[in-house]
Design a protein with these regions (language model features):
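Short flexible linkers and secondary-structure junctions
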Residues: 1-116, 253, 257
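Sec/SRP-type N-terminal targeting helices
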Residues: 6-12, 25, 69, 80-107, ...
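Periplasmic alpha-helical coiled-coil/stalk elements that build and connect Gram-negative outer-membrane
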Residues: 19, 109-222, 330, 334
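Flexible, surface-exposed loop regions and adjacent strand-edge segments
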Residues: 49-55, 206, 271-275
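Bacterial Sec-pathway N-terminal export signals of envelope proteins
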Residues: 1-37, 43, 195, 201-239, ...
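Extracytoplasmic loops and strand-loop junctions of Gram-negative outer membrane beta-barrel proteins
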Residues: 54-60, 216, 265-268
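Transmembrane beta-strands of outer-membrane beta-barrel pores
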Residues: 38-42, 80, 259-263, 287-289, ...
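Short segments within alpha-helical structural elements
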Residues: 26, 168-193, 346-403
């Protein structure tokens, strides 16, 4: 299953969620930046100053600054309190849990699909084995019918009927073999198994019969369902979102430090020979004074979303109860059908043995032998079908109870 592309995608989705959390929490760390600049005045700005020696005369033009300027600046900021970063820290655990639960929910569906595809292949293989046994029996019957025909004990009708029955069984065998190929291909697909590699499957009918039996008196606990757990996590995250909007009136406080190195000169090749550094440290505080009622509207919207999620939770709870009742009802019905088909095999086997013996004694016709053989094969195949339907129902009940394991 680890080779399944969807499983790999789920692992990537979890990884993306973890990275998003780290990105949000990174704002708690100091943010350090550097910048540099170089400037040359093609024409220097000037200031007009009165002539002290001739106050009533024209004003004097005095150049402002120098022709060449350069600066290197280092700045660092540290969030002390910020609502965005604060809520990111509070919700990080729930977002990790949400990603894990989302992945687990999808994995459960994959496991269910793999189990059902696996049992479908086993069912077809067991049916093929029954058909092969029937072919062996029919081949022997055909030889017996031919021998009786050659000896004149029976007419050609019995021989032809035996031939028809054998041909039908051979046709069923071919259909079963081709069906198995398609089902194995589908099983490989849902497993993510390379299609060109052989897939070795083992089955034990007795073990399957034992595994198929479950306690029919147990009740559902929706808290065991990963879908319900995910909804609970979503409710917590939505509540945190409402709290975020409620707290959006709080100020943002951060500390900062700046260090500047300034270079100035009228001659370019002398620019970096002398520097004039300066530095500052301080606190920055910002208050949201008025945002056009956006905060209030966001709170109302978030509360509505929370209420909707609550209703989703209630509806999902009811759906899970219905799903469990339906799955358990199907299981009980399939269990009764399976036990009935077990009895049918015993009866069909007794009928076949009796009819075969009476045919050999000349009491019964060959047609009755064919009918009893067909009934026996049908009873065995029906028993297999009932067993695998019981296994499918077993899986559905376990899924409804939240007991499907994905820890492989």
């Amino acid at each position: 299953m680890h080779n399944q592309p969807l499983v790999k995608q789920l692992n990537l989705d979890e990884g993306i969620a973890r990275q998003n959390i780290r990105i949000a929490l990174a704002d708690w760390l100091p943010q350090v930046n550097a910048s540099a600049g170089l400037q040359h005045y093609l024409k220097q700005p000037v200031f007009l100053f009165p002539d002290i020696s001739n106050p009533t005369g024209p004003k004097i033009l005095i150049p402002n600054g120098v022709l060449y300027n350069s600066n290197i600046q280092f700045s660092a900021t540290q969030n002390i309190f910020n609502n965005d970063v604060y809520i990111a820290g509070r919700t990080a655990g729930n977002y990790r849990l949400q990603a894990s639960q989302t992945s687990r929910s999808a994995l459960i569906e994959i496991v269910v699909e793999i189990n059902k595809a696996f049992y479908d292949v086993l069912l077809s293989r067991e049916q093929l084995n029954i058909i092969k046994e029937e072919i062996d029996r029919l081949s022997k019957s055909l030889k017996d019918a031919y021998a009786l025909y050659q000896s004149g004990t029976s007419d050609v009708i019995d021989y032809k009927r035996a031939t028809i029955s054998l041909n039908n069984a051979l046709s069923q065998k071919k259909n079963a073999e081709e069906s198995i190929k398609a089902k194995i291909s589908y099983l490989k697909q849902v497993m993510g198994y390379p299609n060109e590699k052989p897939l070795n499957l083992s089955s034990n009918i007795l073990s399957m019969e034992k595994d198929a039996i479950i306690d029919t008196l147990q009740n559902i606990n929706v808290y065991n369902r990963i879908e319900y757990q995910l909804l609970q996590t979503n409710l917590k995250l939505q509540k945190s979102k409402t709290d975020y909007y409620r707290m959006s009136f709080l100020p943002s406080l951060s500390a900062f430090a700046n260090y500047n190195i300034i270079y100035q000169n009228d001659v370019y090749n002398q620019l970096f020979k002398s520097s004039y550094p300066n530095s500052t440290i301080g606190l920055s505080l910002s208050f949201p004074i008025f945002e056009g009622t956006k905060r209030i509207q966001n709170i109302k919207k978030s509360k509505m979303q929370y209420e909707r999620l609550t209703l989703d939770t209630l509806n999902t709870r009811n759906e899970m109860n219905t799903q469990f009742v339906s799955a358990m009802a199907s299981y009980k019905s399939d269990l009764a059908a399976y036990r009935m088909t077990q009895q049918n095999i015993e009866i069909a086997q007794d009928v076949y043995n009796t009819v075969k013996l009476q045919y050999n004694q000349g009491i019964k016709t060959y047609l009755e032998v064919i009918v009893s053989e067909t009934d026996l094969m049908s009873a065995r195949i029906n028993n297999l079908n009932a067993l695998f339907m019981l296994m499918f129902s077993n899986i559905d009940v376990k899924r409804a109870l939240g007991e499907i394991s994905v820890d492989y």
